[in-house]
């Protein structure tokens, strides 16, 4: 499994560690592959759940790591990555709210910070050679720490299956709770959980009930709708049901409420950055509610050209986040444009949750451009319907000239 002659040049490496099968095998592999190399395990707490972190340090040390750093990034993740991204309206290929993609830059940044702290000369990740994450992580590393060597075991070692990894660990008496019969590959954080693999690899298969773990099936959700009120300031959710909450706590509260109503499920076949298609089932209950609330307030406050520009920013931002280009001048530019528009995105919105749907049913804003008196068909003092005639003649001038030239 490892080279007979060990590689040199790496003395200390920081590994993005989850405690799963892959990264548990990476620790001994690094020690066997690199001469006199110290392994520092790093885990980012981005809201994947306490159960994922219990015993993690002990497991890393038992696998051969010299130390394990668990860094709490939950609040920063929601405040500085999720909130700015959803303010742009970014949604990949019309359906995906970018849960995995948004988490990668903050994890990579924290990994680099740990590497600087411990004096490491290399970074390591457990991403496969077929997925998007290898590009996302290494793109961030290139922007933040181009001097550090990057090690990607899945592109180097001979192991190709879960069975290979299990056999590798067993041969070294390293304990793992993983089994060869794992069905799905899952990735969770505060924003969402993703599910891939198993029967989902055939797009003709409907996802079984065992796929979903965060939300109830819409058909099993309560028969009575629930209403949740959001207050929004500058494109950020500040209150849930009139309660002031931090970004992370607001998201957690909405996750709890919306998941009971089956809100936030999608089943998509997406275009990966590396060129292939993949099928994924995603659950984003609280995020779906937040997204609906922001768009509802935008309908009130953004004029036609501003709305068009916001949609263009959203499309660019969706691809940028998905493709792992967070630490770039383009990202800074798009976020600045979004922040300018978000100055007016203030107000209150009520979202109706019912059997998988999150619908904005009430909305108001101090910056609203909607006026009931202007929009009615009755007489008003601001809009004289006679003025429309001149506007229409100018608006259709090009069509009129074109028709005249063709005669």
Curated annotation (Swiss-Prot):
What is the name of the protein in this document? Argininosuccinate synthase
Pathway recorded for this protein = Amino-acid biosynthesis; L-arginine biosynthesis; L-arginine from L-ornithine and carbamoyl phosphate: step 2/3
Q: Which GO terms describe its biological process?
A: argininosuccinate metabolic process; L-arginine biosynthetic process; urea cycle
Q: Which family does it belong to?
A: Belongs to the argininosuccinate synthase family. Type 1 subfamily.
- UniProt-listed InterPro entries: Arginosuc_syn_C, Arginosuc_syn_N, Arginosuc_synth, Arginosuc_synth_CS, Arginosuc_synth_type_1_subfam, AS_cat/multimer_dom_body, Rossmann-like_a/b/a_fold
Q: Please name the top-level EC class of this enzyme.
A: ligase
> Please, which domain of life does this record's source organism belong to?
Bacteria
User: What does the record give as EC number?
Assistant: 6.3.4.5
> In the record, what terms sit under GO molecular function?
argininosuccinate synthase activity; ATP binding
The question of whether Ion transport is a record keyword is answered with no
Assembly and partners are described as:
Homotetramer.
Q: Which organism is it from?
A: Shewanella denitrificans (strain OS217 / ATCC BAA-1090 / DSM 15013)
The UniProt annotation places ATP binding at 16-24, 44, 126
- Where is this chain's protein located in or outside the cell? Cytoplasm
Keywords tagged on the record: Amino-acid biosynthesis, Arginine biosynthesis, ATP-binding, Cytoplasm, Ligase, Nucleotide-binding
For this protein, the record's Pfam families field holds: Arginosuc_syn_C (PF20979), Arginosuc_synth (PF00764)
List, alphabetically, the HAMAP family matched.
Arg_succ_synth_type1
Positions that bind L-aspartate:
128, 132-133
Residues the entry annotates as binding L-citrulline = 96, 101, 132, 136, 185, 194, 270, 282
One GO cellular component, as annotated? cytoplasm
Show the catalytic activity: L-citrulline + L-aspartate + ATP = 2-(N(omega)-L-arginino)succinate + AMP + diphosphate + H(+)
């Amino acid at each position: 499994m490892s080279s007979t002659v060990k590689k040199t040049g790496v003395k200390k490496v920081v590994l993005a560690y989850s405690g799963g099968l892959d990264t548990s095998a990476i620790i001994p592999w690094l020690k066997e592959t690199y001469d006199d190399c110290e392994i520092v395990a790093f885990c980012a707490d981005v809201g994947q759940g306490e159960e994922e972190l219990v015993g993690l340090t002990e497991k890393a040390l038992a696998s051969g790591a010299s130390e394990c750093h668990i860094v709490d990034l939950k609040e920063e993740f929601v405040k500085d990555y999720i909130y700015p991204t959803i303010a742009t309206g970014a949604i990949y290929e019309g359906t995906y709210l970018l849960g995995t993609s948004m988490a990668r830059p903050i994890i990579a940044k924290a990994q680099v910070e740990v590497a600087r702290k411990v004096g490491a000369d290399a970074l390591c990740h457990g991403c496969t050679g077929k997925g998007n994450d290898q590009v996302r992580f290494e793109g961030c590393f290139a922007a933040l720490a181009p001097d550090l060597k990057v090690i990607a075991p899945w592109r180097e070692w001979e192991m190709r299956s879960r069975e290979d990894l299990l056999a590798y660990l067993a041969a070294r008496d390293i304990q793992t709770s993983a089994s060869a019969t794992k069905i799905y590959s899952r990735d969770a954080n505060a924003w969402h959980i993703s599910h891939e693999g198993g029967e989902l690899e055939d797009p003709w298969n409907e996802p079984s009930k065992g796929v979903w773990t965060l939300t109830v099936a819409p058909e099993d959700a309560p028969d009575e709708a629930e209403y949740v009120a959001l207050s929004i300031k500058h494109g950020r959710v500040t209150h849930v049901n009139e309660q002031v909450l931090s970004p992370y706590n607001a998201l957690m509260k909405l996750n709890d409420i919306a998941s009971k109503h089956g809100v936030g499920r999608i089943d998509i076949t997406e275009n990966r950055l590396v060129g292939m298609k993949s099928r994924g089932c995603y659950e984003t209950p609280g995020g779906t509610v937040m997204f609906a609330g922001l768009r509802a307030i935008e309908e009130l406050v953004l004029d036609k050209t501003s709305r068009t520009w916001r949609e263009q920013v959203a499309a660019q931002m969706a691809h940028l986040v998905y493709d792992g280009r967070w630490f770039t001048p383009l990202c800074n530019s798009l976020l600045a444009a979004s922040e300018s528009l978000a100055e007016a995105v203030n107000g209150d919105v009520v979202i109706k949750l019912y059997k998988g749907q999150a619908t904005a049913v009430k909305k108001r804003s101090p910056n609203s451009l909607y006026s009931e008196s202007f929009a009615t068909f009755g007489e008003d003092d601001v809009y004289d319907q006679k003025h429309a005639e001149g506007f229409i003649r100018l608006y259709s001038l090009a069509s009129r000239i074109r028709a005249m030239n063709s005669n």
